[in-house]
């Protein structure tokens, strides 16, 4: 008898826009599961296009980047539903990995800092230096690399 699959929910925030993000996320998940011999159950939720939100039965939640302004959607149905879901996940202590646009929306919603348009867009692969020692980051090198291609930034962190 095999072990239960790892349940992974991906919240697709691309709103149908052409992108490489979803393909890369699928490839990384499949490569990871194949290398480690883990069975996975992967479900994609079209959050912006169809207001689809996963339940809380998953082991891993990834919420993607996406196009557009994280400032202009606060009253749109998908955004209201998404931020209520984020509040619920926080209340039940379920971690969610937020990528770019998703992180910016969470920062705006929880007032974690000022979300604003950058003066110029930077594109490239940049080094990231780990400052926190936590089990979550085990296996990462002290310096790892991330893709940089955003138009918005979070500044002036709200420490309260």
What do the predicted segments below correspond to?
Residues 5, 39, 58, 93, ...:
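A structure-centric signal for secondary-structure junctions around beta-strands
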Residues 50-53, 86-87, 118, 134-137, ...:
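Short, flexible, glycine/charge-rich loop motifs used to bind or transfer phosphoryl groups or to couple energy/partner
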Residues 54-56, 109-110, 140-141, 159:
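Short glycine/proline-enriched turns and hinge-like loops at secondary-structure junctions
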Residues 67-134, 145:
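Cysteine-nucleophile active-site neighborhood
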Residues 1-79, 83:
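N-terminal beta1-alpha1 cap of cysteine-dependent amidohydrolase-like domains
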Residues 10, 44, 97-100, 148:
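A structural signal for short, well-ordered beta-strand segments and their strand-loop junctions
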Residues 139-160:
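Catalytic beta-strand/loop cores that center a nucleophilic Ser/Cys/Thr
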């Amino acid at each position: 008898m095999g072990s239960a699959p790892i349940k992974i929910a991906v919240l697709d925030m691309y709103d149908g826009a052409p992108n490489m993000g979803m393909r890369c996320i699928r490839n990384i998940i499949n490569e990871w599961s194949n290398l480690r011999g883990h069975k996975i159950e992967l479900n994609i939720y079209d959050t912006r296009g169809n207001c689809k939100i996963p339940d809380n039965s998953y082991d891993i939640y990834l919420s993607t980047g996406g196009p557009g302004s994280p400032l202009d959607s606060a009253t749109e149905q998908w955004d209201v539903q998404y931020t209520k879901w984020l509040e619920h996940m926080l209340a039940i202590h379920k971690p969610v990995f937020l990528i770019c646009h998703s992180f910016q929306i969470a920062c705006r919603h929880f007032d974690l800092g000022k979300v604003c348009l950058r003066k110029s867009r930077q594109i490239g692969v940049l080094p990231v230096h780990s400052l926190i020692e936590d089990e979550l980051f085990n296996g990462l090198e002290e310096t790892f690399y991330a893709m940089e291609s955003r138009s918005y930034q979070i500044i002036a962190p709200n420490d309260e």
